[in-house]
UniProtKB/Swiss-Prot annotation:
Homodimer. Binds 1 Mg(2+) ion per subunit. Binds 1 zinc ion per subunit. Its cofactor is Mg(2+); Zn(2+). This is Phosphoribosyl-AMP cyclohydrolase. One of its GO terms (cellular component) is cytoplasm. The keyword Signal does not apply. The lineage of its organism: Bacteria, Bacillati, Actinomycetota, Actinomycetes, Mycobacteriales. InterPro entries: PRA-CH (IPR026660), PRib_AMP_CycHydrolase_dom (IPR002496), PRib_AMP_CycHydrolase_sf (IPR038019). Pathway: Amino-acid biosynthesis; L-histidine biosynthesis; L-histidine from 5-phospho-alpha-D-ribose 1-diphosphate: step 3/9. It comes from Mycobacterium avium (strain 104).
Length: 115
């Protein structure tokens, strides 16, 4: 799958050719996770609506939920003003975090809201 050249031209990738992907749950608006995408992962996500990312540690693409069953159906993808981050709005099935938690931001609160 090839990324549309008009979209590719707008992306500002890091030195490894990746863009940051912020993943937000459609219903709750919670931020679920942050991941990386290369052009091919973004193209596949746009084509299939299955959240597809790039694993820096494994050096390959992965489809969220392919092995765990904890899938992300992508409703929308937005590019930020700088072109270096995409925002995916998803329906999450199961936990988004590799720990099994609903969100990767469920564990450690560094600053609690004021009352």
């Amino acid at each position: 799958m090839m990324l549309d050249p008009q979209i590719a031209a707008r992306l500002k990738r890091n030195a490894d050719g990746l863009v940051t992907a912020v993943v937000q749950e459609r219903g709750s608006r919670d931020v679920l996770m942050v991941a990386w995408m290369d052009d091919a992962a973004l193209a596949r996500t746009l084509e299939t609506r299955e959240a597809t990312y790039y694993s820096r540690s494994r050096g390959q693409q992965w489809v969220k939920g392919e092995t765990s069953g904890h899938t992300q159906y992508v409703h929308s993808v937005r590019l930020d003003c700088d072109g270096d981050t995409v925002l995916l709005t998803v329906d999450q099935v199961g936990g988004a975090c590799h720990t099994g938690d609903h969100s990767c931001f469920d564990a450690d609160v560094l600053l609690h809201p004021q009352d």
